[in-house]
């Protein structure tokens, strides 16, 4: 693709962490093709982060039912979607497409240069996820991209166009906006804690979180923002009873962009191997990430101010003392 010509589409599904480690791809494309319209086909509640950071111009929903036809060989293709794909000069897909059926169908209706990237990094290569996702951009002579995800939130422009269905015009006012109530940082210094993840085996024991909160309450002047969603269940409510209500606040099941605004105002972050830890790192927060058995070389959150705490005994072997020492040195 020649600079300044056509539009670029990046197709990226996956969970929060999967999307965050793709942010360097958007940043590299912005740098290589300044002024070119850049769009992402993904899950709007996650991909909206890229729009909030002005890394993309438009977010389009990957949940369109008609998209399923593009994964069947020789089937009929939805006309609106076919015209949608035809509107791009460059399409980069990180979808799981082992037989190349999706690529084959897209190229039936679009003359765009199509680049297929990995939906997940190859564990055998031991290459960090951000670097694995940047590899396909070498076909565009992009070799020196910054592999660290960086998210600088920008207040939305009036009437911004962001989320829409493929092949349809964007709805005005659809942009995930900066929340009106962003006063976390206005009442002292806040420390964000995410005591959950997508898997229980990645979680530090709940009693350790209790001891940690009690110690930090006594030894510091921090207020505490407890972060979580459905995966945490009642854990946040249980932990919130440990401290006076004047020192603790829940941020549970917030829209992701709103959560990002809240996190951005915190002095630091403590969490597990989770997408929220990747988000905190991308926002530039100093952070402590309590790590278990996942391959750290591939999946560790990348950030200039992130410290990983681990032990030979897995995440359960990380002590409250280890975390307290990390808080003292980092925050």
Per-segment meaning from a language model:
Residues 1-331:
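Catalytic machinery of carbohydrate-active enzymes
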């Amino acid at each position: 693709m020649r600079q300044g010509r056509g539009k670029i589409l990046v197709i990226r599904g996956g969970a929060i962490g999967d999307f965050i480690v793709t942010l360097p791809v958007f940043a590299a494309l912005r740098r290589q093709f300044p002024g070119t319209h850049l769009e992402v086909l993904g899950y709007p509640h996650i991909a909206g982060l890229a729009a909030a950071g002005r890394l993309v111009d438009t977010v389009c929903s990957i949940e369109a039912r008609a998209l399923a036809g593009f994964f069947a060989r020789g089937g009929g293709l939805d006309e609106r979607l076919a015209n949608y794909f035809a509107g791009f000069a460059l399409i980069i897909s990180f979808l799981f497409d082992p037989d190349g059926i999706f690529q084959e169908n897209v190229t039936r209706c679009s003359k765009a240069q199509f680049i297929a990237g990995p939906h997940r990094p190859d564990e055998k290569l031991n290459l960090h996820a951000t670097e694995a996702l940047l590899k396909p951009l070498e076909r565009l002579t992009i070799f020196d991209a910054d592999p660290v995800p960086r998210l600088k939130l920008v207040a939305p422009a009036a009437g911004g166009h962001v989320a829409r269905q493929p092949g349809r015009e964007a709805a005005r006012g659809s942009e995930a906006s900066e929340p009106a109530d962003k006063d976390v940082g206005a009442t002292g210094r806040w420390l964000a804690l995410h005591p959950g993840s997508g898997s229980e085996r990645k979680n530090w024991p709940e009693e350790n979180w209790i001891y940690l909160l009690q110690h930090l309450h006594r030894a510091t002047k921090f207020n505490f923002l407890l972060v979580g969603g459905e995966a945490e269940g009642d854990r946040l409510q249980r932990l919130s009873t440990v401290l006076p209500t004047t020192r603790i606040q829940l941020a549970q099941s917030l829209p992701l962009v709103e959560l990002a605004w809240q996190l951005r105002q915190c002095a630091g972050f403590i969490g597990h191997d989770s997408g929220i830890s990747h988000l905190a790192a991308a926002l530039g927060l100093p952070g402590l990430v309590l790590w278990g058995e996942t391959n750290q070389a591939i999946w560790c959150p990348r950030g200039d101010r992130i410290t990983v705490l681990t032990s030979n005994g897995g995440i359960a072997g990380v002590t409250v003392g280890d975390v307290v020492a990390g808080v003292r040195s980092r925050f």
